[in-house]
Amino acid sequence: MLSRFEGNQLKAEEIHRFSNDPVVLNGVLYWDIVRMMFEIKRSISLALAKGGFDAIGIDTWGVDFGLLDRRGNLMQNPVHYRDPHTVGVPEQVFKIIPKEEIYKKTGIQLMRFNTLYQLYYLAREEPALLTQADQFLLMPDLMAYFLTGEKVQNLEKAVDCPGGDGEGTRPSYHTG
């Protein structure tokens, strides 16, 4: 969407639309982040051709993430929240942290695909991946990194993550 103020009204114009279909590789459902970035860059080019813009906003599903190595390279395509790898994981976590405590800290609905459960799954099932990772970026921040080369974390999404309390406390996104 390309939005602009005309007088005191906000006008929005769709300039490009693309599907966001996950891909299955070896039985795992992944975000097709490479194709998405291609389409996002295409959208930016189309917006520039229509007169440009002052800012870009990235809005996407908040629970999925990418892991970067020490050189800033994406270690694997982000696993899609619809992948069943976290089935049963919340119950394992609740044995360690009561669900009431998780809800009290985050205020978000306890869904099996939340970031906390995805990270717990990785810690249990793929610990080498987390050990080798240098940084963790949620999807909007990962996309912003691919566009700008800057690694930043959006505090609005901190509530979705372990360590974030929804009150401005920044969770640690470095894995090392």
Could you say what each language-model-derived stretch is?
Residues Y30, V93-I97, P171-S172:
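Short, surface-exposed amphipathic charged segments that create phosphate/polyanion-binding patches used
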Residues L46-K50, K95, R124, A128-T131:
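Secondary-structure boundary motif
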Residues I102-G176:
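Gly/Ser/Thr-rich active-site cleft segment
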